[in-house]
Amino acid sequence: MPNILSLTCICFNSVLYPTTSFFFAKLPEAYAIFNPIVDVMPVIPLFFFLLAFVWQAAVSFR
């Protein structure tokens, strides 16, 4: 529960003070080559969620 509360506070802080962006921070210069990978990473769990439905469709939703 404290983790959810602290995350909520962080989100509200990023809304109130948009100059310090929490979700859209830039990577350090040395890791700039990984920018395309980092942009796609939040979508990866959705692929697993969709894979569960495809798998169930393949086995006729047993």
Swiss-Prot record:
Membrane topology: Single-pass membrane protein
Localization, UniProt: Plastid, Chloroplast thylakoid membrane
GO biological process, one term: photosynthesis
Main location group: plastid
Transmembrane segments: 33-53
Entry-linked InterPro entries: PSII_PsbK, PSII_PsbK_sf
Pfam families: PsbK
Gene Ontology cellular component terms for the protein in this record: chloroplast thylakoid membrane; photosystem II reaction center
Coiled coil: none
Record keywords: Chloroplast, Membrane, Photosynthesis, Photosystem II, Plastid, Reaction center, Thylakoid, Transmembrane, Transmembrane helix
Name of the protein: Photosystem II reaction center protein K
Natural source organism: Agrostis stolonifera
Name of the gene encoding the protein in the UniProt record: psbK
